[in-house]
Amino acid sequence: MSNRGRDYLVLSQCAHVCQRGVRFGPWMYVRTHHDGYHLFPDEMLFDIERDPHEQDDLASDRLDACGEAVRRLAEWHDSMMKSMDCDVDPLRTVITEGGPTYARGFPRRYCERLEATGRGWAIPELKRRHPREFE
């Protein structure tokens, strides 16, 4: 890597969800590791230049861009892990500790809220995705 830096930007978030994304060219790719009970898909891809509010997920249509994003994330991840004293990715640590900070202990109350607001249809999928949190 030169002193110029990379031609892409990697972002991680572990407060409300556990996601890592990469911004390159017109694309914003987001990989969801824990959806914070929001039923996000595992992968999302947005054309930020045409869709700055990230409303139109193109992941299923642009597998080429998703593949490039995954390659860039892997390159970044390998570089970061080599530079750390710890051999565990901090995002993995958050997940093994119970998930995103503000989602911990939240699923039962959230299900009550979903029922009260007419969105109870989402509860079976939440329980399927997060069985340990509902034990």
Indicate residue ranges for each PLM-predicted region.
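Long, internal low-complexity/basic segments
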Residues: 60-135
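C-terminal cap/loop subdomain of S1 sulfatases and analogous C-terminal strand-loop tails that border
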Residues: 1-44, 48, 122
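Intrinsically disordered, low-complexity polar regions and short flexible loop motifs
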Residues: 51
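Carboxylate-dense, calcium-coordinating segments in secreted/extracellular and ER-lumen proteins
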Residues: 54-58
